[in-house]
């Protein structure tokens, strides 16, 4: 539905209903039964990237600010999860690095928020961010699945998916082909683009990283 939700008619409907901000999330193959057939191919992802930026054109756009969770990584310094800027707490109280990454080693019923933020998985996130210097490839799961698999294994984090508990190997195996196909296209786009001189990069200082 990537063309439907970026169409002129859909955007105009949002504006008419008073919407002034929209954040697009790409499909993530989370869960044992998740289909990889629903993942965008490189051509489709490039279309979404360009279309979302066209919609949010401040001079000629329709009056709604749109952002793309995957394609606008450069404006927030890549992945913001794992406590860098945000994390997710599921219905069971498990402190997860991201709403899409159901692994954890801490729970708010047993740990303070500070303890949750200092859990090994979150610290591994901070040690490895940014997960890719090309911020069109920001995610440790979708575009860099080898990293997520490694840090979950190294930290001993457990699956916290309440519907379909899934090993990190199974999850990441669904992302390798996508990552391999997107990488050359993303690198070409990144190398041909001009980037902000003073980007938002609140990373852990290199001298403090444990990697």
Predicted segments with their positions:
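Radical SAM enzyme [4Fe-4S]-AdoMet core and its adjacent flexible, acidic
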Residues: 1-78, 82, 91-96, 100-111
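Active-site lining segments that contact anionic ligands and/or coordinate catalytic metals
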Residues: 84, 92, 134-136
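Flexible mid-to-C-terminal extensions adjoining Fe-S/redox cofactors in radical SAM and related proteins
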Residues: 100-211
């Amino acid at each position: 539905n990537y063309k439907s939700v970026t169409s002129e008619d859909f955007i105009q409907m949002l504006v008419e209903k008073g919407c002034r901000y929209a954040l697009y999330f790409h499909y993530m193959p989370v869960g044992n039964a998740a289909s990889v057939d629903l993942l965008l191919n490189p051509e489709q992802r490039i279309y979404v990237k360009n279309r979302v930026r066209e919609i949010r054109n401040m001079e000629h756009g329709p009056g709604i600010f749109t952002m793309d969770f995957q394609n606008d990584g450069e404006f927030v310094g890549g992945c913001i999860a794992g406590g860098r800027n945000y994390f997710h707490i599921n219905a069971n109280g498990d402190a997860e690095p991201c709403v899409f990454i159901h692994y954890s080693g801490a729970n708010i019923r047993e740990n303070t928020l500070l303890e949750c933020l200092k859990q090994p998985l979150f610290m591994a996130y901070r040690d490895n961010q940014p997960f890719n210097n090309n911020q069109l490839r920001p995610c440790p799961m979708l575009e860099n699945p080898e990293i997520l698999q490694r840090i979950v294994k190294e930290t001993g984090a457990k699956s916290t998916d309440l519907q379909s508990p899934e090993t990190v190997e199974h999850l990441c195996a669904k992302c390798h082909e996508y990552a391999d196909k997107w990488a050359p296209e993303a690198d070409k786009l990144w190398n041909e683009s001009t980037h902000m001189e003073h980007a938002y990069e609140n990373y852990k200082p290199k001298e403090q990283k444990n990697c």
